[in-house]
Design a protein with these regions (language model features):
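Hydrophobic h-region of N-terminal signal peptides that target proteins for export
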Residues: 2-11
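Substrate-binding groove of N-acetylhexosamine-processing glycoside hydrolases
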Residues: 14-30, 198-201, 207, 249-261, ...
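Catalytic cores of large soluble enzymes that bind and process phosphate-bearing ligands
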Residues: 37, 41, 45, 98, ...
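Solvent-exposed loop/turn segments at secondary-structure junctions
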Residues: 100-102, 144-146, 175-178, 216-219, ...
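N-terminal small/glycine-rich loop or linker at the start of catalytic domains
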Residues: 126-144, 364-373
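Substrate-binding cleft of carbohydrate-active enzyme catalytic domains
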Residues: 135-319, 329-331, 337, 393
Length: 651
């Protein structure tokens, strides 16, 4: 009797989940994984399949003569763009699609289908029909605040989002483009025109459009700090380009023209233009008073469109200015795409969507990974934000999503963001609601290539640690807490409300589970989970140390005149606790450097590593201060207040 090897749709750990899966009865012999293709098979799809299947030890694809391939691709014009049918049975896979993108997405589903049965891999016999709910599924990566991907990691990022059916990649650039005419604002390891061109071509191979995002209004301090451009600043060496200063338009004209030359004819070009709060407060005061703030803003967008429209790209802009004054929509080109960015666990995002819809503009929803300023993303917040916003975007039939990853403080890691990023990818592709529980069940197999639910549990455990550390009134702050002086009275008072033991136990559980983990796929992302857990553990231990040192020093003070042995013991332990803190920072520094170098260029790394060394140095100096206090006590049998020892006393 033939046995049923088809796996019910509920058991297929695929991200995204296909729209329709029909099980097909087949024998064990018919469950052989198809691994041969004709010479014309999509090379990007082949690269993705080979990368995944080699890592899983399934093996690479082989090229055979036409008519002999076990994976075949057929054209079916009745299917919609990006849609596909995939039939797997009898050791063969048949792909049907109306376009190359659909065929590629079918191959990406095939890549995730194999399941391990005992010691061998098998593929379920299924018929799948699938198509995206939203046309555009774009990842926006901040590459301007410190982390700046190496070319190898840019390519890995693009390959990975393509494997999970995203079709747009948008690097957010403020000053990082190395302009041939205006190189001074850029970091020495910035993105050159040749690199931008190469990334565009590479992305296109994987059916991903590279969408430049060049800030053109606010957030331009790293350009305006250069004296050559300082006269274009709204406020001295500030953040906002004054739109009525010729230097502003001349500079933007040059770099945008050069970026367009590098990327060719992108479908969109994002001009950002968000958070312009200082417009009219400086040298444009009279200009804005005369013309009106919204009119000045709209004129800037019109000017940017004039630069970009000849390329065929539609301009994109953030929506915050329009939400403040919807009348702006009457003044800007109707071809513009408005990117609707709103973060946090809001009850609904429909009012923001409705505002843009009433203006008659196409829009994309831009949820966030909630990773900024955090040791690890605020996963709970990100999932609520993405789930609600994307579901409402699908109901409103928006053009797509523009999933954002930000690095405001320059310390956060791209590799920490895959869980919320890929949830957004799944939610934008699937027509149905994507439950966090189902995504958690599917993620380890789809992303890490392992049948181990512990990976998703650990992601959520790290989110739980963050919740313990951040009360509702304090958020986006775990990086700051990591560097905060635990002996600061204000910080200590806030942290007194935190169950530090619970934080450490939860973090250490993740550390222990990830200590030896090397999944076949994306092993570095697992290492970054370990690093985050260890940093959380060190953060909580730092505040424990401060509390314990205060108690030990108070005990020393109370015994200073009548119990020399107890006093010296307390002082010695205070010193040891500072050494422990020193060692924690110095141990973490190379781990952080390893994680950084996996993904980013070295430019900003020294600045971040210096914080580890400075924190360690402070601990060394405090250890030495306790030793000096000990020596003084041996001569005088008196001790100064703790704040004096810690160099915190008023002069």
């Amino acid at each position: 009797l033939a046995i049923l090897l088809a796996i019910a749709a509920a058991a297929l750990h695929l991200v995204p989940q296909p729209a329709h899966v029909e099980n097909v009865a087949c024998s064990p012999r018919d469950s052989t994984i198809p691994q041969t293709v004709a010479a014309g098979f999509d090379p990007a799809a082949r690269a993705e399949l080979d990368e995944r299947w080699r890592a899983l030890r399934i093996g690479s694809l082989r090229t055979v003569a036409n008519g002999e391939a076990s994976i075949v691709v057929r054209r079916d014009e009745s299917l919609t763009p990006q849609a596909y049918r995939l039939t797997v049975s009898g050791g063969h896979a048949a792909i049907e699609s109306a376009d190359a993108a659909g065929a590629f997405y079918a191959a990406m589903t095939l890549a995730q289908l194999p399941v391990r049965s005992g010691r061998r891999w098998q593929v379920p016999c299924v018929r799948i029909e699938d198509r995206p709910s939203l046309r555009w599924r774009v990842l926006s990566d901040d590459v301007s605040r410190g982390p700046l991907p190496t070319m190898a990691y840019f390519e890995e990022r693009i390959r990975t989002i393509a494997a999970f059916k995203m079709n747009g990649y948008s690097p957010y650039m403020e000053h990082v483009f190395v302009s041939p005419t205006d190189p001074l604002p850029a970091p020495l390891d910035g993105i050159t025109p040749a690199q931008l061109h190469a990334l565009t071509a590479y992305a296109a191979r994987f059916h991903v459009a590279l969408i430049p995002d060049q800030q053109t209004f606010a957030h331009m301090h790293n350009t305006l700090r250069v004296e050559r451009y300082a006269s274009a600043a709204e406020l001295p060496h500030g953040f906002l380009l004054a739109p009525n200063v010729p230097l502003s338009s001349e500079y933007l004209g040059r770099i945008i023209t050069q970026e367009l030359a590098a990327v060719g004819r992108p479908p969109f070009f994002h001009v950002s233009s968000d958070e312009t709060a200082t417009l009219g407060l400086g040298q444009t005061r009279a200009y804005v008073a005369q013309r009106g703030r919204s009119a000045v803003y709209a004129e800037h967008i019109v000017a940017m469109n004039r630069l970009i429209a000849p390329s065929g790209a539609r301009i994109m802009l953030w929506d915050d200015g329009i939400q403040q004054d919807p009348a702006i929509m009457k003044l800007i080109p109707h071809s513009a795409v408005i990117v609707n960015w709103h973060y946090g666990a809001l009850p609904t995002f429909e009012p923001y969507i409705a505002t843009i819809a009433r203006g008659g503009f196409e829009q994309m929803a831009a949820p966030g990974a909630s990773n900024w300023n955090e040791i690890f993303p605020a996963v709970d917040t990100a999932m609520i934000n993405e789930r609600r916003f994307i579901d409402e975007a699908k109901q409103a039939r928006l053009l797509g999503i523009f999933q954002t990853v930000w690095h405001d403080d320059g310390e956060t890691l791209y590799e920490a963001t895959w869980y919320p990023v890929l949830y957004a990818a799944a939610a934008a592709w699937q027509s149905n609601d994507v439950s966090p529980e189902r995504f958690a069940a599917d993620f380890p197999s789809a992303f890490f290539g392992v049948d181990d639910a512990g990976y998703s549990s650990d992601v959520n455990a790290l989110g739980g640690v963050l919740r313990r550390l951040e009360p509702p009134e304090l958020y986006e702050q775990t990086d700051s807490l990591f560097w905060a002086d635990a002996f600061n009275a204000g910080v200590a008072a806030t942290m007194a409300k935190v169950d530090l033991r619970a934080v450490r136990l939860e973090a250490e559980s993740v550390e222990e589970r990830r200590y030896f983990s090397e999944p076949p796929l994306h092993a570095n992302a697992a290492f970054v989970m370990f690093l985050a857990a260890r940093r959380y553990d060190a953060l909580a231990r730092k505040f424990q140390i401060a509390s314990e040192v205060r108690a030990m020093y108070a005990d020393a003070l109370s015994h200073a005149h009548d119990d020399r042995e107890t006093t010296l013991r307390d002082l010695r332990w205070c010193r040891y606790w500072m050494w422990e803190l020193r060692d924690a920072y110095e141990e973490l520094a190379p781990l952080y450097a390893r994680a950084w170098r996996y993904e980013s260029r070295d430019g900003h790394l020294a600045s971040n590593l210096e914080r580890y060394h400075l924190a360690a140095q402070q601990a060394i100096e405090r250890a030495d201060a306790f030793e000096r206090a000990t020596q003084e006590y041996l001569h005088s049998t008196t001790l100064p207040p703790l704040d004096v020892v810690l160099n915190r006393a008023n002069p």
